[in-house]
Amino acid sequence: MLGGHSQAVLDLYLRRNGLGAGDVAKVEALAVPPVSLEQSLRQGRIDVAALTGIFQDKALAAGGVRRVFRDYDFLGAFTAGSYVFRDDFIERNPDTVRAFTTGIAKAIEWSRTTPREEVIARQTEILTARGRNEGPDALKYWKSWGVAGRGGLMTDREFATWSGWLKDVGQIKEVKVRPRDLYTNEFNPYANGGTPR
């Protein structure tokens, strides 16, 4: 089992293309580290790889493989991840949470309104300045942060998609939590039509 996003998207794709639960269960999903997926695919160790983002773009640019589907093809634009803080941390440090969230929100919007080449150049500067011996080669494939909402605003849909899937595949009997109880946009300066200062 792959777990997480890759497992859910694979299952959704198979089900939406006519496979029943019995057939889906016959698909052997293997967890392979993302950095090893392309090599495993090219060496024939696996038949299909759930390549995402830069890993996918790099593999496609090298040729010899093709994209079968993207989660966007059947889910549309959505944000698949989020930052989380513990409730007690938020209560003790609301200004810190607001500053962090504002910084992330502004960075998301800056990357959307700035020419791609400039964003990549800035990322390269940051990468180099960190001094961690990280190569910037993969940055040439960067497109976006994969965040749907303005400034990273979250919606119920980002959570309901997955809770519905968990119910459909029998991992839970009923959805007992409301998506709205899982997140807040309270600290995001773009909430309610706002803009950051």
Residue ranges and their predicted role:
Residues 21, 66-67, 173-174:
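Residue-level detector of short coil/turn "hinge" positions at structural boundaries
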Residues 31-37, 129-130, 186-191:
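Short, mixed-charge aromatic SLiMs
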